[in-house]
Every structure is written in structure tokens, then in C-alpha cells.
């Protein structure tokens, strides 16, 4: 399974990492990513990439889409509209329709593997993860509000409707029932901007009607971010900041914290084979070969337990991301890049460098992290 974070134009970081995975997979199986992964999930920009991969596109196809259309997707709204949002949705809609088709929906014949997009239903004030699983309760073709009939482009647009940046997306399920028309915004404002743990639940929880078997030999989840950097917080250096400045910084802080929490969920329920250190207490949560009397530093540096030793976790898990802090960018080979500029969701002027940052981060990807999965 493959889970892709949200992050606006920073989806190019994701693609830089995916490019490496695609090469490794092709070398082992000869197929595309949709042939290797059975289920691909995405939130916001991750939903664009996940939908493209599920349709059979390559990373080269999607890199071309982002590099050629990225600036048009962030087309400034008219002056009066900017009271509500910064960018008009029309160019993005047109680009999504061009790539996915106006009438392509979630029916199984249209996708090469299972697909999941995370959205936020404003009408019901709840996260709405919508999948192409044909056995799911709300994917029954007999229902007038069957999810499988939603146009793929519109579902992706709903998942990318970031508040402040873009207007919401209105989706009509049943034209004869007004109560089946809902307003959606970006899935990144739910707890699932990193959809990896949600993907695990939707694949294994019986209520979602897939019921895949758990276990290190049965499930592998690869989770990919769009780049991240720790923040000191809205009031860390200026505890008496005004309320407007404080509130403005809260969404980013909350999203980062929730993203890390979902990552920790996966590393504790699953078996982490690779991931960055999370903090000084739990480090990377990769199971290691420890012996009595080791110092903390020695424990952190100890070799990992071989994957041939089954530890009874629910799945194997690898998390790849790029550290966009000053120190992280320097380590990746980009000391001249301004960290604040590349962290912005709409940093379309940094399209080339974001892709290169992703490619540099991809050097960490190894097939050893994938265990026994071919």
C-alpha cells in the first residue's frame, strides 16, 4: 500500500521520492507503481498523485503535469474574490479534467488498483475518506448516492480545496435529493493529511469490507511526505504576540503535529523499517538489536532486527520525507535554499528545486525496507 501526504506544490518532493521507488519496483517486477501497490491513498496534492498512479500514469507523467501546469493551477482570484480565497479553481479543474477525463469515475474498470482520497465534508463537519473499494457500503451501484459514480477529477478537486487558497467544491450525489449535495474542502484539514494509518484501517477493519489480513508478511505501507520542518510555534519566541498573528500560525502547527502523530501510530502498530528520528525520546522506533548496559546513544546506533525475524506487528512500514529546515536542506545538498520559501504550499517559483529536493531525499530509499515484498 502507498500513502501520500498533502502539501500543495510540494507534491513535487513526493514525486522526486516516488521516482526512485518506481525505478526500484520496475527493476524487480517490470511493472508500474499501480502494478506493485494494491491500494494507493492520497490527501490534497497527494490525492492528485494517487489518482494519477491508480490510473496507470508514471512518475514522469505526473512530474510533467506539475512542472507544466503548476503555475496555472495557482491562478490568482479576482480582487473581490480574494476576501474569500487567494486562487480561482477554474484552471485546476480544467487541468484535472484534462488528465483524468470529464466522465471517468471510481468504477473498477477505470482504475488499475484501489484508490482512496481524503476529503473534509463541511456540510456534515466530518472527514470523508472515499475509496474505490467496490464492496464498500456506499459503493453499492444500487444506491442513488453510490460513491463510484463520482467523477474522479471532482473527487480530487474536493480533496485539494484548501481553505484560504481555493474555493470549496460542491459535489452532488443524487440530483433528485438536495440532502445529498455536500460542500467539501481540503482533506488536509482533517487528521489525515498523512493518510497512512487511515489506509491501514480501511484495508483491515471489517466495517470497510476489505478485511485484508494483518501481519508483517501480509501488509507493507510506504508513506511519503511533501517535506516538513519543525516550527518553534506561534508564541515560542514572542509569547505576547497579538491574537491575529497567533491564530494565523495555528493551522500549520496543528497540521504538523497531527501528521507526526499519524506517523507514530504507524510506527507503533506497524513495524518501522525506515523513518527519520521523531524526537529524542523515541527516535525512529525502528526495532534494534539491544543488549543490557547499552547507553542511549549506543541503543540508537545499534543495528536493526533483521526482517527475517517476525516481531508480530500488524504491517511493515517505511516513511520517506525531506527535512526542509535549514539544517535539513544543508544535509540534502541545498545550503543556499531559503527554508521559508520552499515550505509554502503555493511556492510555484520553486518548482524545479522542490523536485530536486525530493530526488535528494530519495537516496534514502532501499528495497531492503520493503521486506519480502517483491
Stretch-by-stretch model annotation:
Residues 1-374:
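Patatin-like phospholipase
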